Design a protein with these regions (language model features):
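Positively charged n-region of N-terminal signal peptides that target proteins for export
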Residues: 1-4
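Glycine-rich, small/hydroxylated-residue low-complexity segments
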Residues: 6, 14, 20-446
């Protein structure tokens, strides 16, 4: 019996030691996660506390988001920093150093002037909850769910949101490997008598993977980075009593952006099941395009400039940029755009466009007039019926314009179809349609 009791004591000591070791490892990694937030420009952590337990621990801290960061994100001045309280429940076990640990977080707004307003929208000052799965090696899967908004005011507006979620996957160095956004529903309704309008958004699912992980400290910077993205939107409707209605159904988007030797290239495909403009409905929208030879450092400099513009002053967006120099840097890389397919339908009839454009041989420092010597462009347009019938009530003026375009040679009749081929002629510095008439003639009244 003594041997059994001794063995049990040894087992208990080993288990207790393992649990203690595991809880220490969890605390080390938890504190590393919190400390990394300070590396994000515009974030500051304070009042950090941690209560260690064997199988569960608690932690909390204040997260201050600077008004300068908010200004860059919102595009206008903000009166004060935002102060959030982040309260965490950390679950771990004896095998935490193998299996990792879970963090359940509650995020509350603390600003006195704001939290009562937030509570009127959300029912409390809790703006979001989060679940983090973290391994001791450092990998993290973070999922944030924003509190649903259910606000109605008969005099001003209605605001409703449901299941707005955001997620990040981080590697052991806290670099972002992927990001995702999900929205079940957002409904905004402006009840102002002078400008009644609605925005309805449903079924959003956006997933982006970064080919080269993005440093968490640079997550709010506007930079081109290699990625693969997919997105779906079930419904997007913009309803306005004055300006009319636009609705998109079943939108799908895929994009791939690559960078090699500071040159970027992208391939994008957009598909939309239906596009309704007032009472006119188009279906089967497809855009398949490619862009090549993008000067990534130059574009990033422009994006950096745009993100730091003081929109509340009269400062020009391009202040500090030499536009001739910037254009030269972009054009000397021989950029090109190719639209393999742009098409959509009205009933059974479709309109289709192909386009291929590029700048070749431009030298930095040349006059921008040299663009007209370096430009190549060609394309094709076809419509299964007349443009007047295709666009119908959306552009009734087309009934008068189309016959003139046909007689002048910009369009050709091909049975029931209307077609056109066009190509840029560098000698004439003009786009020639159907090898017959130039675009300049159109602007000069034929």
């Amino acid at each position: 019996m003594k041997k059994v009791i001794s063995a049990l004591i040894v087992v208990i000591v080993i288990v207790a030691g393992a649990v203690y070791f595991a809880s220490n490892k969890v605390e080390e990694n938890y504190q590393r996660i919190v400390d990394r937030l300070n590396d994000v420009n515009g974030f500051k952590v304070s009042e950090n506390s941690y209560q260690k337990g064997f199988f569960g621990s608690k932690g909390s801290f204040d997260l201050i988001v600077s008004k300068d960061l908010l200004k860059n994100l919102a595009g206008k001045d903000v009166d004060e920093d935002l102060n959030f309280k982040v309260e965490n429940e950390i679950s771990h076990s004896v095998l935490a150093f193998v299996n990792g640990f879970d963090i359940d977080s509650k995020i509350s707004i603390q600003n006195e002037a704001i939290k009562n307003i937030v509570a009127s929208f959300l029912g409390s000052n809790v703006v979001a909850t989060a679940k983090t799965k973290a391994s001791v090696s450092g990998d993290k899967d973070v999922n944030v769910k924003f509190s649903d908004i259910d606000f109605s005011d008969k005099q001003t507006m209605n605001v409703h949101t449901k299941d707005v979620k955001f997620g990040l996957k981080l590697d052991e160095k806290d670099n972002v490997n992927s990001a995702k956004l999900g929205v079940e529903k957002v409904a905004l309704k402006d009840l102002n008598e002078e400008n009644k309008a609605e925005v309805n958004l449903e079924g959003v699912d956006i997933d982006t993977s970064y080919t080269v992980p993005v440093e968490i400290s640079k997550i709010f910077e506007s930079k081109l980075a290699p990625y693969v993205a997919k997105a779906k939107i079930k419904k997007l409707a913009l309803l306005d009593e004055k300006d009319g209605n636009v609705a998109l159904d079943d939108l799908e988007y895929s994009s791939k952006f690559e960078v090699s030797n500071d040159l970027g290239s992208s391939k994008d495909v957009v598909k939309i099941g239906a596009v309704a403009v007032n009472k006119v409905k188009f279906t089967d929208f497809i855009l398949d395009s490619k862009i090549a030879n993008i000067n990534v450092p130059t574009i990033n400099n422009i994006l950096d400039r745009l993100s730091n513009v003081n929109v509340d002053s009269n400062e020009s967006v391009f202040a500090g940029l030499n536009l001739d120099e910037v254009m030269g840097q972009i054009l000397e890389k021989n950029p090109s755009v190719k639209v393999d397919r742009l098409s959509f339908k009205n009933g059974d009839n479709a309109i289709k466009l192909k386009l291929d454009a590029a700048i070749n041989g431009f030298k930095s420092g040349e006059s921008q007039l040299a663009i007209f010597d370096k430009l190549s462009l060609n394309g094709e347009l076809s419509v299964d019926e007349t443009l007047a019938k295709f666009f119908d009530t959306l552009f009734p003026e087309m009934t008068l314009i189309e016959p003139t375009l046909i007689s002048a040679g910009y369009l050709k009749e091909d049975g029931k179809k209307v077609v056109s081929k066009f190509k840029y002629d560098p000698n004439k510095k003009d786009i020639i349609f159907n090898e017959k008439v130039g675009l300049q003639n159109l602007f000069m009244g034929f």
